[in-house]
């Protein structure tokens, strides 16, 4: 008789599985055999309030060996020059701290293991949690913007050729005819159709009166003829 499977599938086959933080070599890299001790305590764990770990991010094209000192200001950014290139130093500690609190940080410190044959994630001595950087600085090259003579670069504005015979009938929002000096012309144009319509009404009324008069005269003539005919009979 077959057995029924479990109602759910667990994430791991065994609850006693031990997750190792041992660092594996990425593709394209070689294993380094001359690892040295990292300046933490004997277990590669940070001693509280006695040591600080700083992360300083440099551009890949900067030769760090030429750097004798690093000007740091915790209140604002600073600048320095290496090989005639200017660089800006920014304190990103607050940004990294907020990312760490939201579990969004991807920064971890790798230190040599006790055997010096592999790397592992550095942890704190208190709760064995991954070690966080006390300070994070980013170094980026600043661009030099050359001086621009705008009087030579600026191109004079050319007006669009005007077409003669056009009439302005619509105005932009916030403007009226007076702003374009066409108030009188527009008013005259508006009055003309009213005059024409009134004149047309007069012509139509006179034609109606004329037709009514003609009908009345025809009716009177017909009545007179009918009376004469009756009188003869």
UniProtKB/Swiss-Prot annotation:
GO CC field: nucleolus; nucleus; RNA polymerase I complex
UniProt feature, compositional bias: Basic and acidic residues: 179-191
Keyword Glycoprotein: no
Biased composition (Basic residues): 208-233
Subcellular location: Nucleus, Nucleolus
Keyword terms of this UniProt record: DNA-directed RNA polymerase, Nucleus, Phosphoprotein, Ribosome biogenesis, Transcription
Main location: nucleus
Keyword Nucleus: yes
Family that this chain belongs to: Belongs to the eukaryotic RPA34 RNA polymerase subunit family.
Miscellaneous section: Present with 3360 molecules/cell in log phase SD medium.
Function: DNA-dependent RNA polymerases catalyze the transcription of DNA into RNA using the four ribonucleoside triphosphates as substrates. Component of RNA polymerase I (Pol I) which synthesizes ribosomal RNA precursors. Besides, RNA polymerase I has intrinsic RNA cleavage activity. The heterodimer formed by RPA34 and RPA49 stimulates transcript elongation by Pol I.
Protein name according to UniProt: DNA-directed RNA polymerase I subunit RPA34
